[in-house]
A protein has these predicted regions:
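Beta-lactam-recognizing serine transpeptidase/beta-lactamase-like catalytic domain environment
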Residues: 225, 263-291, 306-517, 521
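Solvent-exposed, polar/charged alpha-helical surfaces in well-ordered, non-transmembrane soluble domains
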Residues: 23-31, 39, 43, 166, ...
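Extracytoplasmic/periplasmic proteins that interact with beta-lactams or build/remodel peptidoglycan
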Residues: 65-264, 499
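Active/ligand-binding-proximal structured segments within catalytic/core domains
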Residues: 296-305, 316
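Short regulatory alpha-helical segment in sensory/regulatory domains of signaling proteins that mediates
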Residues: 30-34, 254-258, 377
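Gly/Ser-rich catalytic serine loop of serine hydrolases
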Residues: 142, 289-299
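Short solvent-exposed beta->alpha transition segments
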Residues: 18-28, 35-86
């Protein structure tokens, strides 16, 4: 009988004893909160509001702008209601501030288990029912966007001198409700934010961090308590490579051009790849940096470079008939011009399409032309700090596709940024990825590519011949200019419209001018380059 009594007593103890401990329950609750597992939190809590803890804890995170929450359990002590567990919360906020505070959980024992007795004070000690968190941010002075020599590009005075600057800088606007929501706390409707260009791309750096007050407000917006206050951090400048001397010279050349067509122009420094000027008329979409256009005969710089690797030289004898048929497609020169038997230098200078179509199919294949295009930055990803693109080149098949690509009337696509970098590479001897924002400089995935000496010895005299006796000879360009004209047909029909190109360099300046739908490069684009060069 005694043995039976002892066994029965032991079974009753096992059934009636409390499972777990307040430490275990508090640790489980905090771990689940940190992971955002609100359902698991509901299972270890009592007095849970209707709908569970997802609503109040989600509201807390949204109101304060919590990006990440780290919770550490502290001391657990018994009290008259059960036990209290202290914890340390470290909240990384969307405002880039870090909020640390000490909270506490009330634990109770019910039904032989420990539970978190939930109330708003489990989120923050002084928070009560009906209250919410409100952020008050006061933004510091915004950082400036600078050109060389400390010129403030983002100032109204600078933009008034050259409206194209705003395509690079973007604008500062008051945030809409949707924009503020997208940026997250501490942004509110009406705050100043960047829209487009550098202002948007470097919003966090330029805006700095506001002085931030986290308040607890009750009904009627009554301030019940201040939970935290953080001082402001001033906005930092963004340095660019834009040089207003060249920007204004290019702006004047474009604004006075004798054409009503859209004009896009980029000026680079060959020795560094830095963008010195970007001009567009009219404004709107950033075509000079992000547009895509057929290159026309400016692509002959790439093709001639590939031919050089196959042993051709400026003096190499070539044919320049008015037309040539390759795989059933007939290619022609502008106005069906012809030069008969001539040199490669002369065919390049007068921009003979048929010469390059024939030479490409005779000496090159798709991979060799694609490899040379890659050397000049095609398909590379530029890191200007704002959206931009370089040339696009798909490896052509043999025959008609290769022939068309060879003189820029295939699937190859470019913009003034990419073509200015091609000209810059011939001047410097190294293709360099273009740079616009220099501090903080975005990481570059594209690397400089050194050109071979034989290539340079071929291309430089050929580009000089374009100016002295070729398609640009009648423009009256100043001494020391090397260039290449381009007339790039687009659309369809017997006489399709064409874009007008002129790319080139003089000294440590490289440029590309595109007149969209402008016709002949020598007539429309080269005079703009001439006007620019004569002002610098």
């Amino acid at each position: 009988m005694l043995v039976l009594a002892l066994v029965a007593g032991g079974a009753a103890y096992l059934l009636l004893r409390t499972h777990g401990s307040p430490q275990q329950t508090a640790a489980s609750y905090l771990s689940d909160w940190q992971r955002g597992d609100y359902r698991a939190m509901n299972k270890v809590s009592v007095n849970v509001p209707h709908g569970g803890l997802a609503t109040p804890l989600g509201q807390f995170a949204a109101q304060v702008g919590v990006r990440q929450l780290h919770l550490v359990l502290g001391r657990v002590t018994p009290d008259s209601a059960g036990a209290q567990a202290r914890y340390t919360a470290t909240a990384d906020l969307a405002s880039s501030h870090v909020w640390r505070y000490t909270g506490q959980l009330q634990l109770v024992k019910q039904n032989r288990a420990w539970w978190v007795s939930w109330s708003p004070s489990a989120i923050y000690p002084s928070l009560t029912t009906g209250q919410r968190f409100v952020l008050h941010a006061v933004w510091p002075a915004r950082g400036q966007i600078l050109g060389t020599g400390g010129t403030v590009l983002s100032s109204p005075a600078t933009i008034a001198q050259s409206g194209s600057i705003s395509l690079l800088t973007g604008n500062v606007v008051t945030a809409t409700a949707a924009q503020a929501k997208a940026l997250g706390a501490p942004y509110h409707k009406g705050d100043l934010i960047g829209e487009g260009g550098i202002e948007q791309a470097f919003q966090a750096r330029l805006a700095g961090r506001p002085s931030l007050t986290i308040q607890i407000q009750g009904p009627g917006n009554h301030v019940a308590a201040t939970a935290a206050h953080f001082p402001s951090v001033a906005g930092q400048p963004v340095q660019t490579s834009i040089d207003m001397r060249y920007q204004l010279a290019a702006s004047h050349a474009v604004s006075t051009a004798k054409t009503s067509k859209p004009v896009d122009m980029v000026v680079l420094q060959p020795s560094t790849g830095r963008v010195l000027a970007v001009i567009e008329r009219p404004g709107g979409f950033d075509r000079a940096l992000s547009g895509i256009f057929p290159p026309g005969s400016t692509f002959k710089v790439v093709t001639a470079s590939a031919l050089t690797k196959k042993g051709l030289r400026p003096s190499s004898a070539v044919q320049c008939p008015p037309t040539v048929t390759i795989d059933g497609r007939t290619f022609h020169n502008f106005d069906n011009e012809q030069a008969g038997r001539t040199s490669l230098l002369n065919a390049f200078a007068i921009s003979c399409n048929t010469t390059f179509a024939m030479l490409a199919t005779q000496h090159l294949d798709g991979s060799s032309l694609a490899s040379m295009a890659k050397t000049f930055g095609f398909n590379a990803r530029p890191a200007l700090g704002i959206p931009a693109t370089l040339g696009h080149f798909k490896t052509p098949r043999q025959g008609v596709d290769l022939a068309a690509d060879a003189f820029g009337q295939g699937t190859d696509l470019v913009n003034p940024l990419s073509q200015a970098s091609v000209a810059a590479a011939i001047e410097d001897g190294t293709w360099r990825p273009p740079q616009l924002v220099t501090n903080p400089a975005p990481p570059q995935s594209a690397q400089p590519r050194k050109l071979d000496a034989g290539l340079l010895n071929t291309l430089r005299p050929m580009m000089r011949a374009v100016v002295t006796k070729g398609t640009a000879a009648g423009v009256g360009l100043p001494p020391g200019v090397y260039g290449k004209t381009g007339t790039a047909e687009y659309g369809s029909g017997a006489n399709p419209p064409s874009h007008a190109w002129f790319i080139g360099y003089r000294g440590n300046l490289a440029f590309a001018v595109l007149v969209e739908g402008g016709g002949i490069g020598a007539d429309a684009s080269a005079p703009i380059a001439n006007a620019f060069l004569r002002r610098v």
